[in-house]
Design a protein with these regions (language model features):
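Conserved small-residue
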Residues: 1-240
Length: 240
């Protein structure tokens, strides 16, 4: 019979305030630099998660879905914020209204207002929303590790991350959906091929770096006859 062990060292809770690591192609880029992480390597929190997944090396994947609603931009929204649904009047929880309170710690509420306010991205939180919208990998067996945002698997309203069957010597595959109207199904194919020894890795998140940070993302395009094809989402693809 399952029973909760209240004080087990592996018990931990991830919230919208938890420190997390950014990996993959967006790590260290201008897209994710904020006042909190001027180098663009870390962020805070995961929110409105829905669906899940897992890896052959024993980590848990959680999917950030309806996260755009927690932010507000009262200025000029960039195209990605307009398309994905960041609001212009208030966040759905109005967390930004608690900014400036005497109990606020490290801009924990200020960051939900992504309006441009400073001279550069490292002076404000204009890029805070860009640190959300990812598959987040968690090592459930090591409570000292940070949750890791795998930016290579795409940024959208993630719903589920289902793995294909791992076959030694072949790339690993995960299938994902965007849980919004008229959106897409996605497939991630790792560059690295599966080594069955990695199922018993001593460092699960490093193994995640191997298979989840480098690869190819595809979107499904369906035809009227019910067939379809996978389109590579790359600037090297002339269709894109």
């Amino acid at each position: 019979r399952w029973q909760v062990v209240d004080n087990d060292p592996l018990n931990r809770r991830f919230t919208t305030a938890s420190r997390m690591e950014i990996t993959g192609p967006l790590r260290g880029t201008d897209h994710v630099k904020t006042k909190y992480s001027t180098g663009g390597t870390h962020c805070r929190g995961t929110n409105n998660n829905c669906g899940n997944g897992y890896t052959p090396w024993g980590t848990y994947l959680t999917c950030e879905e309806n996260w755009p609603g927690i932010f507000v931009n009262k200025g000029t929204r960039p195209e990605d914020q307009r398309r994905i649904g960041v609001g212009t009047s208030s966040g759905q929880y109005k967390w930004e209204t608690a900014a400036g309170d005497s109990t606020e710690v490290a801009d924990e509420f200020t960051r939900f207002d992504v309006t441009v306010k400073g001279a550069s991205a490292t002076d404000d939180y204009r890029n805070e929303a860009s640190t959300y919208g990812y598959i987040v990998e968690i090592d459930p067996y090591n409570s000292s590790t940070l949750a890791t945002k795998r930016t290579a698997l795409g940024r959208f309203r993630h719903e589920g991350c289902a793995p294909g069957l791992p076959v030694a010597g072949k790339p690993l595959v995960w299938y994902m959906g965007d849980d919004s109207n008229n959106e897409y199904l996605y497939k991630w194919v790792s560059t690295a091929v599966w080594d069955a020894a990695d199922a018993n890795t001593a460092n699960p998140l490093a193994t995640g770096d191997k298979y989840l940070d480098k690869g190819t993302l595809y979107a499904a395009r369906f035809k009227d006859d019910g067939s379809g094809e996978w389109m590579e989402l790359s600037l090297d693809n002339p269709v894109i």
